[in-house]
Amino acid sequence: MKFCPKCGNLMLPDRKRKVWVCRSCGYEEPFDEEKDREKTKITKKVEHKPDEEIIVVEQDLKTLPTTKVTCPKCGNDTAYWWEMQTRAGDEPSTIFYKCTKCGYTWRAYE
């Protein structure tokens, strides 16, 4: 990755013209194939399906808002909630809930 020295946005390589281009401010900088190869290499591409389970490993839940919703596992009536974009950008985001009592996490399907 390379960032624009003028505006700080991500620069993209234009390999045909052999330059780095900032799509925000238009700044250009020469591209060196040998030196810049690692900056443009995709080392791992991860693709997710919309129905995959998403697990929040560590998060300070006390900072999340709570709402009145029934936990499908224990019946508790309060859960933390957060919103994430899990599908394409033109589709609605997904709301996740985590029970304040048992910790069970589920998503809302609207």
Swiss-Prot record:
Zn(2+) 2 binds at C71, C74, C99, C102. Signal peptide: none annotated. One of its GO terms (molecular function) is zinc ion binding. CDD domains: Zn-ribbon_TFS. It comes from the Archaea. A zinc finger (TFIIS-type) spans 67-107. PROSITE patterns: RNA_POL_M_15KD, ZF_TFIIS_1, ZF_TFIIS_2. One of its GO terms (cellular component) is chromosome. It holds the Pfam family Zn_ribbon_TFIIS. The lineage of its organism: Archaea, Methanobacteriati, Methanobacteriota, Thermococci, Thermococcales. The gene is tfs. GO terms for biological process: DNA-templated transcription; regulation of DNA-templated transcription. Belongs to the archaeal rpoM/eukaryotic RPA12/RPB9/RPC11 RNA polymerase family. This is Transcription factor S. Keywords: Chromosome, DNA-binding, Metal-binding, Transcription, Transcription regulation, Zinc, Zinc-finger. It comes from Thermococcus kodakarensis (strain ATCC BAA-918 / JCM 12380 / KOD1) (Pyrococcus kodakaraensis (strain KOD1)). It is found in: Chromosome. PANTHER family: DNA-DIRECTED RNA POLYMERASE (PTHR11239), DNA-DIRECTED RNA POLYMERASE III SUBUNIT RPC10 (PTHR11239:SF12). Disruption phenotype: Essential, it cannot be deleted. Zn(2+) 1 binds at C4, C7, C22, C25. Involved in transcriptional proofreading and fidelity. Induces RNA cleavage activity in RNA polymerase (RNAP). Stimulates transcription elongation by RNAP on both naked DNA and histone-bound DNA (chromatin), facilitating transcription through the histone barrier. Stimulation depends on transcript cleavage. In the presence of TFS, the cleavage activity of RNAP truncates RNA back to position +15 in a stepwise manner by releasing mainly dinucleotides from the 3'-end of the nascent RNA. The truncated RNAs are able to continue elongation.
